[in-house]
């Protein structure tokens, strides 16, 4: 009986904990400009969005790791793609035309290392990676 109660409570807590991961990204009604992460059910991974600072829903995380810990596994190297070296690794980083402030990674061909830069959210070029691991997989190895 105790095992049944434990399993029932554990199952309910697990379902409740992950239920919010199915909610869509909700920027809220305010006009702040806060890069956040949400779990995209269709893509099966955490994605970045802009949060306005109030309202919204529980599918809203300050870091990629928080989102992955709550809703899904981190990406594996096998999920990444190799880049065309000329367009995806040699190009200088481009902020793009929009005014967002996303932390991204680019491959610095001169140093042979992946480095952070600020991406505006649209435009830019292919030398633009969501994390260091993706950049290194695409350009370094």
From Swiss-Prot:
Gene3D superfamilies recorded? Pancreatic trypsin inhibitor Kunitz domain
Matching InterPro entries:
Kunitz_BPTI (IPR002223), Kunitz_BPTI_sf (IPR036880), Prtase_inh_Kunz-CS (IPR020901), TFPI/VKTCI-like (IPR050098)
Any one annotated GO CC term: extracellular space
Phenotype seen when the gene is deleted: After gene silencing by RNA interference, the tick attachment time is prolonged and about 25% of RNA-treated ticks do not successfully complete the blood feeding and detach from the host. No significant difference is observed in the engorgement body, egg weight, and hatching capability of eggs.
Where it sits in the cell: the answer is:
Secreted
Tissue expression from the record:
Expressed in the major tissues of the adult female tick, including the midgut (highest expression), salivary glands, ovaries, hemolymph, and fat bodies.
Q: Which residues form the signal peptide?
A: 1-15
Q: Where is the BPTI/Kunitz inhibitor domain?
A: 21-71, 89-139
**Any one GO molecular function term:** serine-type endopeptidase inhibitor activity
Provide a GO biological process annotation: envenomation resulting in negative regulation of voltage-gated potassium channel activity in another organism
Tell me, in a sentence or two, what this protein's role is: Anticoagulant protein that may inhibit thrombin by binding to its exosite I. The recombinant protein delays plasma clotting time and inhibits both thrombin-induced fibrinogen clotting and thrombin-induced platelet aggregation in a dose-dependent manner. May be an anticoagulant for the common pathway of blood coagulation.
PANTHER family per record: BPTI_KUNITZ INHIBITOR DOMAIN-CONTAINING PROTEIN, KUNITZ-TYPE PROTEASE INHIBITOR-RELATED
Q: What is this protein called?
A: Thrombin inhibitor hemalin
Source species, please? Haemaphysalis longicornis (Bush tick)
